[in-house]
């Protein structure tokens, strides 16, 4: 007996075109079946549940009305795309979401023609849709053709400047472009800022029940340029016209808000937009994150991303923890430092829970700032906090900090302002794949004059690095740490301030030195144990700092060993490259040192478990062991010693 839901209509759907033969009542039933199938699939795989459940009706309506893949539906962020994937010839693989060799948890061009533009970071959809619209009008060609361009963007994503840059440009170009504002009053955390308040007022100004009834006759509601006599409709629904002023000033015709879970509203409005739209139009749709699944509705923030769970109870099936997560360790360590220094403040970009700053916000709400999905603003805001005499910790994922890189250079580094960058999700992150990998921050930060760059080898080291950053006032400082649990080391009661630019010796050996930067140290130690069985005892050191380098440690390792190997969870151009530059400048290579640098390969690694991803990268213990044997000219693993 199968525990999968009963889905008689969904079973008849192999591609979106099949939806066009269903009646509106059947499409409503189909939405219910699609919601049940989404819950069932995510219970097996884990993933982003709440966002997808909130757009089930919208997904069905879009594919029923428009002609995908000729019409380009572009999902902002892409984490809400699971129902879309089920309808677009991928239902048979939906229970491989976020797994090795499975479906991506986001939209991905290489996966399906129904994913015209990949995503995983926010606020890109309007720019992409505008690009497709211009390409269409200038005779561009794609295998599926070019029809309408539809961006579906959440209210949280609208807090990013990029979305408004795109809307401003679209209003100027006046191309036929459809933007659907999916307003669920929530991104990952509750939304913040003036725009959120504006949307809330817009919703409140028009009694929603009256709006629901009126929207049934959507053709008569549409503002200019869609219908003669629209002036009367605007008078009838004054809140719609007045409420949309912000978007209309940007050059968009505005419709809404309408109920995003009522097919009786969605279908006629979308059909009329498709039939009559000329220039850019914004359709404001109200939805509920987690809609239709009680556990997700009750805890919408936690419903954003879940582990595998029991469908009946919603209880997540998490393996017991052996050590605290790095994120939790950072959050607690920062709270401890803030208790001793009232100048410490914290900044995050819509990720208080993901970065561990929820702990800080609970204790010190007036000293914690969630700037929304606005990394550029967040970095410059932090810079000015530092210029004003405070001690800001700017906590962001490595992959998202990329969005604020110009601000890191221009507003922080050049002015030598003591912003403390807490860089979470460093290295390879697992199920979220290449879009969320923290591969590049070592390279893009360590090349900046005056920037201090640290990496924690374990959770205790992270506590010390938080303390070090808190004490550092001579310019910017960054420390990176991975997703997931620590390694189970004994934790200090309070962090100690590390000497800037000084590493530590872990184990003394001979012939080969392994210099680790970050949490690959654990794999290095495992490799050393395997090498010991072969009679090889490598020296092991933890660099702690990529900038400034511990010159004495590195030069001594080079002088005392036949070979030196660096290991880091980052791309080429990072720690190993800086070590190589030092060795070259000091003429060490002139005297025969064998040097190797183990870095992430020059590819984007698809989702899998972190261990599998590091195996692909060639950076697990067996591969480190093999590198040592190779550089020493000893037989490969598996070959017997002579």
UniProtKB/Swiss-Prot annotation:
Q: Which reaction does it catalyse?
A: D-glyceraldehyde 3-phosphate + pyruvate + H(+) = 1-deoxy-D-xylulose 5-phosphate + CO2
Name the source organism: Ruegeria pomeroyi (strain ATCC 700808 / DSM 15171 / DSS-3)
UniProt keyword annotation of rRNA-binding present = no
How, per the record, is the cofactor bound?
A: Binds 1 Mg(2+) ion per subunit.
What is the protein's name according to its record? Answer: 1-deoxy-D-xylulose-5-phosphate synthase
Q: Which GO terms describe its molecular function?
A: 1-deoxy-D-xylulose-5-phosphate synthase activity; magnesium ion binding; thiamine pyrophosphate binding
Which Pfam families is this protein grouped with? Answer: DXP_synthase_N (PF13292), Transket_pyr (PF02779), Transketolase_C (PF02780)
Coiled-coil annotated spans: none
NCBIfam families recorded for this chain? dxs, PRK05444.2-2
The entry's function note states: Catalyzes the acyloin condensation reaction between C atoms 2 and 3 of pyruvate and glyceraldehyde 3-phosphate to yield 1-deoxy-D-xylulose-5-phosphate (DXP).
Assembly and oligomerization: Homodimer.
Q: In the UniProt record, what gene is named as encoding this protein?
A: dxs
């Amino acid at each position: 007996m199968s525990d999968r839901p009963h889905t008689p209509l969904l079973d008849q759907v192999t591609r979106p075109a099949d939806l066009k033969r269903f009646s509106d009542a059947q499409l409503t039933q189909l939405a219910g079946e699609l919601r049940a199938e989404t819950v069932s699939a995510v219970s097996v795989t884990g993933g982003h549940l709440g966002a997808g459940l909130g757009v089930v009706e919208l997904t069905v309506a879009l594919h029923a009305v428009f002609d995908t893949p000729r019409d380009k539906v572009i999902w902002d962020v892409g984490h809400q795309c699971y129902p879309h994937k089920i309808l677009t010839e991928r239902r048979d693989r939906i229970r491989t979401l976020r797994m090795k060799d499975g479906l991506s948890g986001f939209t991905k061009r290489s996966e399906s023609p129904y994913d015209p533009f990949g995503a995983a970071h926010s606020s890109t959809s309007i720019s992409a849709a505008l690009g497709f619209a211009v390409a269409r009008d200038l005779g561009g060609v794609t295998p599926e053709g070019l029809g309408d361009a539809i961006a579906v963007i959440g209210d949280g994503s609208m807090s990013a400047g990029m979305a408004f840059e795109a809307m401003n440009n679209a209003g100027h170009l006046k191309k036929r472009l459809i933007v659907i504002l999916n307003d669920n009053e929530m991104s990952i955390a509750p939304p913040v800022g003036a725009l959120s308040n504006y949307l809330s007022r817009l919703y409140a100004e028009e009694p929603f029940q009256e709006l629901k009834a009126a929207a049934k006759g959507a053709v008569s509601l549409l503002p200019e340029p869609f219908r003669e006599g629209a002036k009367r409709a605007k008078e009838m629904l004054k809140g719609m016209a007045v409420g949309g002023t912000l978007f209309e000033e940007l050059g968009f015709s505005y419709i809404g808000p309408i109920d995003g879970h009522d097919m009786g509203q969605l279908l006629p409005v979308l059909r009329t937009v498709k039939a009559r739209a000329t220039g850019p139009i914004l359709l404001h749709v109200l939805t509920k994150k987690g809609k239709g699944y009680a556990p997700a509705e009750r805890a919408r923030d936690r419903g954003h991303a879940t582990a595998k769970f029991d469908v009946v109870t919603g209880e997540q099936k998490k393996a017991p923890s052996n050590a605290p997560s790095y994120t939790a360790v950072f959050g607690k360590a920062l709270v401890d430092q803030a208790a001793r220094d009232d100048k410490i403040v914290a900044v995050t970009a819509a990720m208080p829970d993901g970065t561990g700053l929820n702990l800080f916000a609970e204790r010190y709400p007036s000293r914690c700032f969630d700037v929304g999905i606005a990394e550029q603003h967040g970095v410059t805001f932090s810079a000015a906090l530092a210029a004003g005499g405070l001690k800001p910790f700017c906590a962001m994922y490595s992959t998202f900090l990329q969005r604020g890189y110009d601000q890191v250079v221009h507003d922080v580094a050049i002015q030598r302002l003591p912003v403390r960058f807490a860089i979470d999700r460093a290295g390879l992150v697992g199920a979220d794949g290449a879009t969320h990998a923290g591969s590049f921050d070592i390279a893009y930060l360590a090349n900046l004059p005056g920037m201090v760059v640290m990496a924690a080898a374990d959770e205790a080291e992270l506590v010390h690095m938080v303390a070090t950053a808190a004490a550092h006032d001579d310019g910017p400082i960054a420390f990176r740490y991975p997703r997931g649990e620590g390694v189970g080391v004994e934790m200090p009661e309070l962090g100690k301030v590390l000497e800037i630019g000084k590493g530590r010796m872990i184990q003394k050996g001979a012939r080969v030195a392994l210099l680790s930067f970050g949490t690959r140290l654990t794999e290095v130690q495992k490799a050393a144990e395997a090498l010991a069985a072969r009679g090889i005892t490598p020296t092991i050191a933890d660099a702690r700092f990529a900038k400034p380098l511990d010159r004495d440690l590195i030069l001594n390792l080079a002088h005392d060993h036949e070979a030196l190997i660096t290991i880091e969870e980052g791309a080429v151009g990072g720690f190993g490259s800086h070590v190589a530059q030092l060795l070259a400048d000091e003429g060490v290579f002139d005297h025969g040192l064998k040097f190797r640098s183990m870095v992430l390969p020059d590819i984007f690694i698809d989702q899998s478990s972190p261990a599998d991803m590091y195996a692909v990268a060639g950076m697990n213990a067996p591969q480190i062991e093999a590198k040592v044997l190779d550089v020493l000219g000893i037989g490969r693993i598996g070959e017997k010693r002579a």
